[in-house]
């Protein structure tokens, strides 16, 4: 299946470029409490290089594949360690086994919290995939490098819940996956960092399309170029994705 790729990354505010510390404007935009290598405003030390501390929010099979790709970044040898802390937040489920993300986290011995509990640890960046809960501004601001959303549609189309179901019901012929930066107060609104599109297979069900987009989403979390700087959240996450890409290629 041919994948059409579109990348979109807006201009950074002055002072947020490679080799420079983020300006106050950029820190406010990205939710930075302080400069990398300094204090985050709550007394915690903000890291400017790996290994990173990541909190993942997700529920379904699509989210599980994104989590699996991030989890693969943890065990590459101490000298190449990219993530030294990966914890998971999911939502309560009526099933005793829990949702796919919880099943994977338990099997992989990752710490799991049930929303609204998000733990009390310190993290560098958050990652959201198919979570279905609106994150408060106070929560977003706890992450020095902000929170990224991996969303199974070509935003802005089908922002909000059940994008795969809407894609099928409305007969869309093209869909995709978007990686974007989360903003407070609204679902799936913020700068688009990366977007890839695929044709919708004819007569596909929502479950079949979810499988297609799960593979695409995981592939995007494995294949993104390394940025020249880690001084802002966008650069941090593209660096993570590039390193994960190398893990899966080796």
Predicted features, each with a name:
Residues 2-250:
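One-carbon transfer enzymes
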């Amino acid at each position: 299946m041919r994948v059409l790729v579109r990348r979109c990354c807006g201009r950074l505010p002055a002072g947020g470029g490679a080799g420079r510390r983020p300006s106050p404007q950029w820190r406010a935009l990205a939710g930075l409490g302080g400069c990398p290598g300094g204090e985050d405003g709550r007394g915690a030390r903000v890291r400017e290089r790996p290994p990173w501390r990541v909190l993942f929010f997700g529920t379904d099979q699509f989210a599980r594949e994104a989590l699996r790709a991030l989890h693969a970044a943890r065990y590459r040898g101490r000298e190449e360690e990219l993530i030294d802390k990966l914890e998971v937040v999911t939502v309560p489920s009526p099933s005793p086994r829990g949702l796919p993300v919880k099943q994977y986290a338990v099997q992989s011995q990752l710490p799991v919290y049930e929303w609204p509990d998000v733990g009390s640890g310190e993290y560098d960046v958050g990652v959201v995939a198919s979570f279905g809960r609106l994150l408060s501004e106070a929560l977003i601001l706890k992450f020095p490098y902000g929170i990224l959303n991996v969303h199974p549609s070509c935003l802005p189309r089908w922002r909000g819940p059940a994008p795969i179901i809407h894609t099928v019901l409305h007969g869309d012929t093209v869909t995709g996956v978007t990686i974007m930066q989360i903003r407070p107060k609204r679902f799936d609104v913020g700068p688009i960092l990366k977007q890839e599109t695929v044709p919708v297979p004819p007569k596909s069900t929502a479950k079949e399309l979810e499988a297609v987009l799960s593979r695409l989403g995981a592939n995007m979390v494995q294949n993104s170029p390394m940025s020249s700087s880690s001084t802002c959240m966008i650069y941090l996450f593209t660096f993570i994705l590039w390193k994960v890409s190398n893990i899966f290629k080796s």
